[in-house]
Amino acid sequence: MEIAVVGKSEFVVGFRLAGIHKTYEVKNDKDLESKIRECLTDRNLGIIVLHSDDLKHISPGLQKVIDESVEPTFIAIGSKEDAGLRDKIKRAIGVDLWK
């Protein structure tokens, strides 16, 4: 399984420098949704990283798909902490790491 990062260039550049090969730069909200949907169909991806601010710019239907997706698992990082990360990890691996 691979990790992918989707977002604006200033967000993905650090991941690229850290060795993540599947980084996708998007220029607008339409490109963001399109790239997320493309990543959902890639069977080699296990984790997809997004900036938490970008989640505000996608449609409610796609947000629901992201929230319910176990494989690939979506992780939103950035300006605010993702309270659902604990639940996503628990669903993905079946263990609560915080206990």
Curated annotation (Swiss-Prot):
One cellular-component annotation, GO: plasma membrane
Record's keyword annotation contains Nucleotide-binding: no
Membrane listed as a keyword: yes
Keyword terms: ATP synthesis, Cell membrane, Hydrogen ion transport, Ion transport, Membrane, Transport
Subcellular location: Cell membrane
Oligomeric and partner information: Has multiple subunits with at least A(3), B(3), C, D, E, F, H, I and proteolipid K(x).
Role of this protein: Component of the A-type ATP synthase that produces ATP from ADP in the presence of a proton gradient across the membrane.
Protein name: A-type ATP synthase subunit F
Species the sequence originates in: Methanocella arvoryzae (strain DSM 22066 / NBRC 105507 / MRE50)
